[in-house]
């Protein structure tokens, strides 16, 4: 039910919902304009970059994860989050994420994040 609601949201509504959920989790949240990362999350001195703009794509490959990884290196982030509300992640993308400190946030993990904010 939560995921169905997310799939009908415009980008701004989804971005605001994610930011509120991360703030509820104790993160300082900075929304970024353009580029591979949409959010910079800071907590206890650690920086995490999150990419969520492609949340409605049907398939997710390695390229956006490579771009996120490059942004992580540029900003000195220790971790990355890649958010998808629908579609599937290719096997290569899943392996790339695992090997490059990128956590995939989808399905139950996404629902839990969004429900925690309410």
Which residue stretches match the model-derived regions?
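Mixed-charge (Asp/Glu-Lys/Arg
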Residues: 1-118
